[in-house]
């Protein structure tokens, strides 16, 4: 077999492969002889069909079958011979087959770019350092209390935090509209679940009060017939209820499934959960910095096939999140290209780092990661058994751990500094430009 390779561009290769006719002819002959021993043709005893008859009836089909298989196998052999790794499927153009001549074709494909790992000593990483305090636990307990709040009817004017039970009947230019009417609807003032203009005008109303209010709809309101319009609502307050929070006692702890240990056990569980959240957030923050640094330090020319494949994966993920309510054409390639380029680049960079540094996945870390993940579930053993009995899930976990090892390696090579911060600063970072 003869192979020649032409460099079309930095990443594109055109490989010409010539397969001797003997390879095809010998395989065709072998299959026809095997067929002659098994085939049944009228007028001939089983196993006694002349090879010439078998060739006349089945020769063309067997020939095409062999040519297809030889093309595929010779393509793989040629790649190994030339030490080429294609990125994506090739475009194959076979030359017309002539009697007595071998198979010849060209395969055009992109190859993976050569990745040269940059000097990582200047990679700056800021590692948050967080201790979960008693005050942090108190805040979470208070949030849990609010989640268990109950509303009790009061005979006074409604104020922020109250729940108002209201009837309303809306109209636009004197005409009723879809969704504009409700009875005994609970509206919690300050939650923002209703239009602000509607909610604000419930403040100060008492049980039994009635009035008609104007409510302007924003320009970006989903319903076309209401965008930018002002509707009138006749409203009547049935009840005003104020929130009451449960006491933090043994009964409160039991409401979260804690049968023994009471409030102290609840606080222990809350702290343990917060510390797991901190560990995950710390890892995510460091990883994000490392990935940004690696991407910036390794500008790559990428095979378009890989980028397109990643774009399609991202598009399918987006479509599944919308549950089929959005059409694929609403997500053009441009929406995902930047993220696809980043992901493909980082995949190639990490692959080269792992190969060049001889990294192997740490089985101990895989075990520890699995146990940490399982600890957050009601039945940790069920989670552990699932991963151990599911090869695909296990492989995904191992890939994640290996990526974590890469992050640790980069941090060790670079310049890492510790930054003390509170639990709230870590878990609820303020966006740049946020108002004081």
From Swiss-Prot:
Organism domain of life: Bacteria
Top EC class for this record: isomerase
Cellular component annotations (GO), alphabetically ordered: cytoplasm
Record's keyword annotation contains Iron-sulfur: no
Biological-process GO terms, alphabetical: 'de novo' cotranslational protein folding; cell division; chaperone-mediated protein folding; protein transport; protein unfolding
Domain PPIase FKBP-type span(s) in chain numbering: 161-246
Pfam families on file: FKBP_C, Trigger_C, Trigger_N
Protein name: Trigger factor
Organism of this sequence: Thioalkalivibrio sulfidiphilus (strain HL-EbGR7)
Name of encoding gene: tig
